[in-house]
Every structure is written in C-alpha cells, then in structure tokens.
UniProtKB/Swiss-Prot annotation:
Organism annotation: Bdellovibrio bacteriovorus (strain ATCC 15356 / DSM 50701 / NCIMB 9529 / HD100)
GO biological process, one term: base-excision repair
Protein name: Formamidopyrimidine-DNA glycosylase
PROSITE patterns recorded: FPG_CAT (PS51068), ZF_FPG_1 (PS01242), ZF_FPG_2 (PS51066)
Molecular function terms, GO-annotated: 8-oxo-7,8-dihydroguanine DNA N-glycosylase activity; class I DNA-(apurinic or apyrimidinic site) endonuclease activity; damaged DNA binding; zinc ion binding
Catalytic activity, EC: 3.2.2.23, 4.2.99.18
Cofactor binding mode and count: Binds 1 zinc ion per subunit.
Alphabetical keyword list: DNA damage, DNA repair, DNA-binding, Glycosidase, Hydrolase, Lyase, Metal-binding, Multifunctional enzyme, Zinc, Zinc-finger
Name of the encoding gene: mutM
Catalytic activity annotation: Hydrolysis of DNA containing ring-opened 7-methylguanine residues, releasing 2,6-diamino-4-hydroxy-5-(N-methyl)formamidopyrimidine; 2'-deoxyribonucleotide-(2'-deoxyribose 5'-phosphate)-2'-deoxyribonucleotide-DNA = a 3'-end 2'-deoxyribonucleotide-(2,3-dehydro-2,3-deoxyribose 5'-phosphate)-DNA + a 5'-end 5'-phospho-2'-deoxyribonucleoside-DNA + H(+)
Length: 270
C-alpha cells in the first residue's frame, strides 16, 4: 500500500501537471464504487470550478476547488496519470476532464482506493480524527512519547495507528525502528522520552529521503508521470528476511505484528 512518501510524490506530480489551475469540465465515473460508493452527485457540484490546490493529509489526496474538494485514497494499487486520447486502460475507473484538453485517469485494479467529496476536512469522517503529520514541526519526541503512554501494543503496531501519527506504514515503521536501534516488539508504553525523540528524528529523515527518491515502487506504485520510485533499493531491513543485517551481519528476522510482516535485527535493535 502506498504510504506517506508515495502519496506525497503523487501530490507533487499532480501539482506540477495542474499548476495552471484548469477548470474541471467533467467527472466521468466508469463504475459507481471503489472500496465504497462514490458520491457522484456531490462531486458533480465541483464541475465548472477551477482546481486551486492539491493537498495531502495522511495518505489522502485533496484536489481543492472553491466549492470543495475531491478526496482520493490510492488503496493498494491506485495510480493517477495523464491520459491522452486513446489511452484508456483496463481498470481505469475515473476520468477527470479539465480545460486545455487535459484528462487525468485513476486506475485501481484491486479497487481498495476511495473517491469522495470533502467540504470541511475537520468534519469529514475520514479526516477528522487523524493524528499529526510526521514531517511537521509539531510532531516531536515529547508528543510521540505522550501518545504512547499506556499503550500495551507493540511499538511498531502503535506507529501504524493513524491516531498516533499519520502515514507511517509498514515499510517506514520497520525502517525507522531499525535506524533508531529499537526493536519493533517493545511495548509502546515502555519507550523512553529520549528514545522517542531519536525515533521521531529517524522517521522524519527516512520519509524525507523516500520522497526525494520518488517513493518505493513495490507492487503497482508509480508516480503521476508514470515513473517508478527507487527508495526500495535503500531498504535496510524491510523485505530482507533471513538476509544478513547490513550493519552487523546477523540474520534479519521477520514476524507478523498487527497483521503485517515486520523485519528487524535482534542484535542491532534493543
């Protein structure tokens, strides 16, 4: 599933494509639903409006007009691309037609994404209860430490709780914990303030590095330009079960935590 870096890379790509604030001329839905029903009538109220900005909140994209926004979640396999005439593909579910003969296509083979209407982000059920953005200044060691107090779940599971911090999914939780030298199975409530501050620093560093690298292209992820990211070539533990640790040479371990495969080095991470 695309995590924060991948969604931010898509946002930046779309922002470049739509920089001239084109008018939304038509929303063409090839089906009535993705993971959930698409509110076609509400979204149709945005037709005729200029696209004023593209924002990201957690793993959601918000395409803003003066009357509201289209909200997009990429799910497991969703991608946005410019689709010139004749470029219609299997599993294209949404076409956004803009002035200047510009057309964006949303393709999602597994249909785990969503496409929704937003007027007030603070009141929208998908956005209202989200935690802090990890790359913002407000996300710091004391805040993370406070949010983890009393949590008996494994630290890695807690990091993937979108009420604790948004956008840190399976890949980047494993990588950040390795960089900070903290084992993923540590009960979240036992993380010290000092180590929380260290972990926050590594989360920020790794997310920033991945964005710069265009994200991690595993499964179907691609940038809005169609290019792949290449941060996956920098993975130090993720997906490296039974391979030698890049730091100490000990075999990397894996375990399912919170329903997701987790990777770590038992020598380097305590």
């Amino acid at each position: 599933m695309p995590e924060l870096p991948e969604v931010e890379v898509v946002r930046r790509g779309l922002e470049t494509i739509l920089k001239d604030q084109p008018i939304l001329e038509k929303v063409e839905l090839m089906r009535k639903d993705l993971r959930e029903p698409i509110p076609a009538k509400k979204i149709s109220t945005l037709v005729g409006q200029p696209l004023t900005s593209i924002e990201r909140r957690a793993k959601y994209l918000l395409l803003w007009t003066p009357k509201g926004a289209m909200l997009s979640h990429l799910g497991m396999t969703g991608t946005w691309r410019v689709a010139v005439p004749g470029d219609e593909r299997l599993h294209d579910h949404i076409y956004l037609h803009f002035s200047g003969d510009l057309r964006l296509a949303y393709r999602d083979p597994r249909r785990f994404g969503c496409f929704d209407f937003v007027q007030d982000p603070l009141k929208h059920p998908k956005l209202a209860d989200l935690g802090p953005e990890p790359l913002e200044a407000e996300f710091n060691g004391p805040l993370l430490w406070e949010k983890l107090r009393g949590k008996d779940v494994a630290l890695k599971v807690a990091l993937m709780d979108q009420k604790v911090v948004v956008g840190v999914g399976n890949i980047y939780a494993s990588e950040a914990l390795f960089a900070a030298g903290i084992k993923p199975t540590l009960p979240a409530r036992k993380l010290s303030l000092e180590r929380a501050s260290l972990l926050v620093g590594e989360i920020k560093k790794i997310l920033s590095q991945s964005i710069k690298a265009g994200g991690s292209s595993i499964s179907d992820f691609a940038q809005a330009s169609g290019e792949s990211g290449y941060f996956q070539t920098s993975f130090r533990v993720y997906g490296r079960d039974k391979e030698p640790c890049v730091t100490c040479g000990q075999q990397v371990k894996s375990k399912v935590l919170g329903g997701r495969n987790t990777f770590w080095c038992s020598r380097c991470q305590k």
